[in-house]
Amino acid sequence: MTSFSTSAFRPVAFSLGLLLVMPAAFPAPVTLGEDSKEVAAPNRQLLTSTERIDKHIWYILDGISALRKEICNKSNMCESSKEALAENNLNLPKMAEKDGCFQSGFNEETCLLKITTGLLEFEVYLEYLQNRFESSKEQAGAVQMSTKGLIQSLQRKAKNLSAIATPDPATNASLLTKLQAQDQWLQGVTTHLILRSFKEFLQCSLRALRQM
């Protein structure tokens, strides 16, 4: 299995609590002690929930960009034709008109459910990436853990948590096994497609969340 170095993306030691109160100086990390001091500063304006989520998504996007850069530098996947990439039959989450996230027909609650559900569906693919970046698991793990924190933030905004569909663990386990059994070339294509699709999903989510 080919591994990719991700030295360009320096990992941070995440805890879910820290992720949910990420400071304004993004993406530079701070310790919990430093964060407490900044919040206590007399002239410091606290970030709203929407602003924290906005910065949280940008942080993940920065990590994805660094990982994609490493892949593009070490393989020709980024230059492969769309036809070749399309041969990989992945069912990656994506936005559609019915999801209520586009300007036309925007629906806040429907869109929020789609974003949260989509991120939950991406988790199995992010787990797959942990095995693709064996020499630098911490870097890929930073994106994975930060995404978990983002999901929790969005779940707190949802009015109807029961409407958020959770992927079946057995189905995810089967999918992960199938992805890991691909030949080396297909695994490279899969890695590229996951990062590209996740980036596009987050960008669309970012635009929609700014309207909420």
Curated annotation (Swiss-Prot):
Keyword Secreted: yes
Position of the signal peptide: 1-29
In-chain residues carrying the UniProt-annotated modification Phosphoserine: S81
Main location: secreted
One GO cellular component term noted in the UniProt record for this chain: extracellular space
Subcellular location: Secreted
Protein keywords: Acute phase, Cytokine, Disulfide bond, Glycoprotein, Growth factor, Phosphoprotein, Secreted, Signal
Gene3D superfamilies from the UniProt entry: 1.20.1250.10
BP GO annotations: acute-phase response; glucose homeostasis; hepatocyte proliferation; interleukin-6-mediated signaling pathway; liver regeneration; positive regulation of multicellular organismal process; positive regulation of receptor signaling pathway via JAK-STAT; positive regulation of receptor signaling pathway via STAT
Superkingdom field: Eukaryota
Molecular functions (GO terms): cytokine activity; growth factor activity; interleukin-6 receptor binding
Pfam families tied to this protein: IL6
Disulphide bond pairs: C72-C78, C101-C111
Glycosylated residues (UniProt): N73, N160, N172
Family: Belongs to the IL-6 superfamily.
Described purpose of this protein according to its UniProt entry: Cytokine with a wide variety of biological functions in immunity, tissue regeneration, and metabolism. Binds to IL6R, then the complex associates to the signaling subunit IL6ST/gp130 to trigger the intracellular IL6-signaling pathway. The interaction with the membrane-bound IL6R and IL6ST stimulates 'classic signaling', whereas the binding of IL6 and soluble IL6R to IL6ST stimulates 'trans-signaling'. Alternatively, 'cluster signaling' occurs when membrane-bound IL6:IL6R complexes on transmitter cells activate IL6ST receptors on neighboring receiver cells.
Oligomer and partners: Component of a hexamer of two molecules each of IL6, IL6R and IL6ST; first binds to IL6R to associate with the signaling subunit IL6ST. Interacts with IL6R (via the N-terminal ectodomain); this interaction may be affected by IL6R-binding with SORL1, hence decreasing IL6 cis signaling. Interacts with SORL1 (via the N-terminal ectodomain); this interaction leads to IL6 internalization and lysosomal degradation. May form a trimeric complex with the soluble SORL1 ectodomain and soluble IL6R receptor; this interaction might stabilize circulating IL6, hence promoting IL6 trans signaling.
Name by which UniProt lists this protein: Interleukin-6
